[in-house]
């Protein structure tokens, strides 16, 4: 049996401020740092170990992974970073307060932008200072590859391309894998693994920094999945609460 661990980064500064984040490279809040330490302690207490780790090129996911691996005495394992594991790109909404945006555009419109799978938010323009084309971490990308906005389908497409080219072969070779990433990235993976419908993924919420374990067969089909706490597996349908750590 193959085990895969997925973890959404700890609370970020913009999670705390209720802002659309997307590809903006904000760091963890103090609470997020604590959540990451707790996740590492949970995995260590439950006897988990890893051979390789995958993450995005955004510091909130990278730092979460660093902290988790440090808590597990696994800081030495290989870590692969790729933009294809970045959060969904929220276009011109990035940096805006979610409540203020709802007042401006209406709650229904903002809900559609956030939760529908195939509707993109308003795009950035190429002269917008938030456009990432000049960011050195994306220098290998061609202009057309760098998004100006994304819907969940767009995010899923790039995430699954990386899954099939890099992560799935690693799992099939017998390596123990952890992925530290973002809410919509993990939603995309869960949708694929569990073969969720569009309606099913719309209501799916991924909590910050709670280890989500998938048990997979040799063909990487899911047998079952569950969240982990200090006391072990959490009953299906329940999400453990964070403790001060």
Curated annotation (Swiss-Prot):
Substrate binds at residues 8-15, 21-22, 60, 87-90, 98, 114-115, 183-184. GO terms for biological process: gluconeogenesis; glycolytic process. PROSITE patterns: PG_MUTASE (PS00175). Its EC number is 5.4.2.11. It catalyses: (2R)-2-phosphoglycerate = (2R)-3-phosphoglycerate. It is an enzyme of class 5 (isomerase). Keywords: Gluconeogenesis, Glycolysis, Isomerase. The keyword Isomerase applies. Belongs to the phosphoglycerate mutase family. BPG-dependent PGAM subfamily. This is 2,3-bisphosphoglycerate-dependent phosphoglycerate mutase 1. The active site is at 9 (tele-phosphohistidine intermediate), 87 (proton donor/acceptor). The record marks 182 as: Transition state stabilizer. GO terms for molecular function: phosphoglycerate mutase activity. Pfam families: His_Phos_1. Catalyzes the interconversion of 2-phosphoglycerate and 3-phosphoglycerate. NCBIfam families: pgm_1, PRK14115.1. The keyword Transport does not apply. It comes from Bacillus cereus (strain ATCC 10987 / NRS 248). Pathway: Carbohydrate degradation; glycolysis; pyruvate from D-glyceraldehyde 3-phosphate: step 3/5.
């Amino acid at each position: 049996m193959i085990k895969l661990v997925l973890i959404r980064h700890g609370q970020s500064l913009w999670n705390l401020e209720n802002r659309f984040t997307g590809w903006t490279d904000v760091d963890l809040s103090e609470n997020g740092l604590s959540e990451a330490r707790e996740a590492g302690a949970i995995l260590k207490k439950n006897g988990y170990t890893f051979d390789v780790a995958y993450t995005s090129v955004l510091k909130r996911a990278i730092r979460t992974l660093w902290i988790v691996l440090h808590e597990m005495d696994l800081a030495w394992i290989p870590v692969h970073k790729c933009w294809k594991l970045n959060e969904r790109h929220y276009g011109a909404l990035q940096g805006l307060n979610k409540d203020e945006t709802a007042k401006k555009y209406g709650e229904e419109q903002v809900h559609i932008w956030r939760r529908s799978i195939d509707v993109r938010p308003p795009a950035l323009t190429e002269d917008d200072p938030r456009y990432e084309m000049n960011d050195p971490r994306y220098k290998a990308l061609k202009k057309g590859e760098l998004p100006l906005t994304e819907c969940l389908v767009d995010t899923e497409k790039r995430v699954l391309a990386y899954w099939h080219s890099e992560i799935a072969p690693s799992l099939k070779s017998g390596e123990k894998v952890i992925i530290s990433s973002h809410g919509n990235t993990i939603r995309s993976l869960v949708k694929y693994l569990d073969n969720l419908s569009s309606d099913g993924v719309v209501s799916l919420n991924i909590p910050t920094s709670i280890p989500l374990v998938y048990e997979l067969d040799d063909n990487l089909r899911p047998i079952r999945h569950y969240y982990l706490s200090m006391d072990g597996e959490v009953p299906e349908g329940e999400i453990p609460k964070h403790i001060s750590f």
